[in-house]
């Protein structure tokens, strides 16, 4: 309501517990009872008539509940970075939607030990081009900080500044595509210190107005984050998987 109705803000951060992305329409799972991101997307569509919504999930675990809810829906594009293999065992790169929703579900299953470079290359080479093609009216971010190096719930290697970069990239895209409108909901994060610091970095990135206004396209963003061919070749662990996803989603 604050974003789409009253226009009080273009972004919000919902610091909620329990998390939600493992919850299904008829049952909870994986510490989750209600699927906060899915409820927000459905509410935005039904009350405000937002036709297309993207959900970007960077929790360490695949959001199996969110994926199932929208798997056959061409108006909600679910995109998930997560460790694989890991709980709940879903989220393979071949899970791309069904029926009308085919091609509107993207999974980026990262091997244990994956660090920031894979996330940044995935954003610039895959997620942002797909978002440009999709033209969402709202982006909802499932912000899970259990992908932090200090969190014992995964073997991923992000740090506080990684979330700042991810969220800055998404904030820049939101300005281009959907009048800056973005909702962020807290998912996992079980190391209290790193979760708190990562959330602060998330919010800080959303407030970087001068940088957000300065970057005009994906090429500018690539230069700003210094993601060049050498970076792609020498610092990315999941390069073969990302190359296959580019091919499958016609991004080559």
Residue map of PLM features:
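A general "terminal functional-core" signal
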Residues: 1-252
């Amino acid at each position: 309501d604050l974003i789409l109705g009253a226009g009080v803000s273009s972004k919000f951060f919902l610091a909620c517990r329990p998390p939600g992305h493992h919850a299904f329409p008829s049952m909870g799972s994986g510490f989750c009872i209600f699927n906060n991101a899915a409820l927000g997307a459905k509410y935005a569509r039904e009350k405000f008539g937002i036709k297309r919504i993207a959900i970007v999930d960077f929790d360490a675990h695949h959001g199996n509940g969110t994926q199932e809810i929208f798997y056959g829906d061409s108006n909600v594009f679910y995109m998930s970075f997560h460790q694989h293999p890991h709980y709940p065992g879903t989220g393979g790169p071949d899970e791309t939607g069904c029926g009308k929703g085919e091609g509107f579900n993207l999974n980026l299953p990262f091997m244990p030990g994956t660090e920031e470079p894979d996330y940044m290359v995935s954003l610039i080479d895959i997620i942002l081009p797909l978002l440009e093609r999709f033209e969402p009216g709202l982006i909802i971010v499932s912000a899970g900080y259990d992908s932090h190096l200090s969190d014992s719930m995964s073997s991923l290697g992000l740090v506080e500044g990684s979330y700042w970069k991810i969220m800055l990239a998404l904030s820049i895209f939101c300005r281009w595509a959907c009048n800056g409108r973005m909702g962020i909901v807290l998912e996992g994060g079980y190391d209290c210190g790193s979760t708190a610091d990562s959330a602060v970095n998330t919010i800080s990135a959303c407030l970087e107005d001068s940088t957000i206004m300065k970057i005009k396209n994906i090429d500018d963003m690539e230069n700003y984050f210094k993601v060049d061919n050498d970076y792609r070749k020498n610092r990315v662990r999941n390069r073969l998987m990302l190359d296959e996803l580019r091919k499958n989603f016609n991004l080559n």
